[in-house]
C-alpha cells in the first residue's frame, strides 16, 4: 500500500451531512446499534464518481469520524490486491481488507455504495444451509432462496434492469466459503457476481454478507430488507416452516 505525499484532508472535510466522509461514520453508527459492525468488524464504502471513500480497518465503527476515512481513485487502481494507491490516508489506521471486495461492486456493478455486515442472522442462515437445512437440502448449501414474503419487494430485479422483485418472486443470494484473510474472498465474490448477475448481495459462510446498491439509499434499504429476511428465515426454520412455498396468486376484481 502506498499513499500520496500530501494527506489531502480537503477530500474528507465538509459541513454537508450527506458528504461520503460524513455519511459513512453516520451509517456505521446506526449499523453498530443493529449488531452489524460489532467489535470493529464490517464496514462501508461509498463511490462518488471516481472517488471511493472507505472506512478503515480496526476502528470502532460507532466512534468513527470523517478524519478516519480513506479515499482512493477508482480509475487509478491496478489489478493487484495489495498495491493500492490512496489519495488520502488517515495517519492512525490501516486500510480495510474489505477494499478489493468493495471495489468489485463498484467496477462490476457500477454500485454507488457497498455495505459489509457481520450480522448474526446472515451467519446463522449460512450455517443452516451448511447443515442441509435449505430448500434443496445438502445440495443447496451455496444458495439462499426465499419467496412469497412481502419484504422481497425491497430488492431490484437486477443489474441494469428496471423495477423491483414482486411478492411471489424468488430472491436468490449466493453463498461463498470464508477465507482466513478477507481480501482473499475477492475472487470468489467476483465469481458469484458472474454466476448471479442479478444479485445485490453475496453471503460469506460463517462470516457475514456484502450488499451493494446503485446509491447509498438503495444499498441501505436492501441491506435492511435482507437482514429482515435472514432473521425471518431463521425463525421460520425453528418452526419447520419452508422458505420456498407454492402459493396461488390471489385473484382480485381488477385482475
Curated annotation (Swiss-Prot):
| GO CC terms, sorted | cytoplasm
Which EC class is the enzyme in?
lyase
Gene source species: Pyricularia oryzae (strain 70-15 / ATCC MYA-4617 / FGSC 8958)
Name of the protein in its database record = Methylthioribulose-1-phosphate dehydratase
Q: Which SUPFAM superfamilies match?
A: AraD/HMP-PK domain-like
State its location(s): Cytoplasm
* Main function: Catalyzes the dehydration of methylthioribulose-1-phosphate (MTRu-1-P) into 2,3-diketo-5-methylthiopentyl-1-phosphate (DK-MTP-1-P).
Q: In which pathway does it act?
A: Amino-acid biosynthesis; L-methionine biosynthesis via salvage pathway; L-methionine from S-methyl-5-thio-alpha-D-ribose 1-phosphate: step 2/6
